[in-house]
């Protein structure tokens, strides 16, 4: 995600708010509450502020981002908390899965050991988070706190020595 696109995080955070079927969505001003502003205010200034974007043409249509913050999904001072959102018309197409996997790969390369998030229990995204390896480590009456341990990939490395593939 380009620095000039960080301004979209506030709007995307609003899109990440789960609204149960039949409930009215909250006003957009809800994103200005202090407990939600920590997700986007000053983004890019923290040591583990990272964001990836899905773009359609020149429009950012979704993002996954993380940072060290004392938020709903806070585990400890070394575990970044993650947020993910797509505009509704882009959901269900695998974009969120790809963004999450790309973020996990990027964090692994940086040596990050784990990442957390909070999600409303009724949010269909719970299935997505489980599918990419998050597990529930704590819960409240309304939400799950989930954690994904980021393990170094074990791979097979091939070397080309004197024209021989070993």
Where are these regions (language model features)?
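Hydrophobic adenine-recognition pocket in adenosine-nucleotide-binding enzymes
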Residues: 1, 84-86, 119
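A short beta-loop-alpha structural element at the N-terminal edge
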Residues: 1-11
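Acetyl-CoA-dependent GNAT
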Residues: 17-19, 25-78, 83-89, 140, ...
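Conserved GNAT acetyl-CoA-binding A-motif
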Residues: 107-120
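Conserved acetyl-CoA-binding loop of GNAT-fold acetyltransferases
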Residues: 130-140
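Short glycine/proline-centered loop/turn elements that form peptide/ligand docking sites
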Residues: 96, 100, 122-125, 142-148
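Conserved acetyl-CoA-binding loop-helix of GNAT-fold acetyltransferases
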Residues: 83-86, 92-109, 126, 130-131
């Amino acid at each position: 995600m380009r620095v000039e696109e960080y301004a979209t995080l506030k709007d995307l955070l609003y899109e990440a708010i789960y609204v149960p079927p039949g409930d009215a969505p909250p006003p957009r001003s809800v994103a200005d509450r202090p407990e939600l502003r920590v997700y986007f205010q000053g983004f890019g200034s923290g040591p583990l502020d990272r964001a990836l974007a899905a773009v359609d043409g020149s429009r950012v249509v979704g993002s996954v981002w993380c940072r060290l913050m004392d938020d709903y999904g806070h585990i400890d001072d070394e575990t970044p908390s993650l947020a993910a959102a797509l505009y509704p018309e882009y959901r269900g197409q695998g974009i969120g899965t790809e963004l999450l996997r790309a973020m996990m790969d990027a964090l692994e390369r940086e040596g990050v050991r784990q990442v957390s998030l909070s999600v409303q229990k009724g949010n269909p995204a719970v299935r997505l988070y489980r599918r990419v390896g998050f597990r529930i480590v704590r819960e409240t009456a309304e939400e799950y706190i989930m954690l994904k341990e980021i393990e170094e990939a074990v791979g097979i490395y091939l070397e080309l020595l004197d024209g021989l593939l070993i």
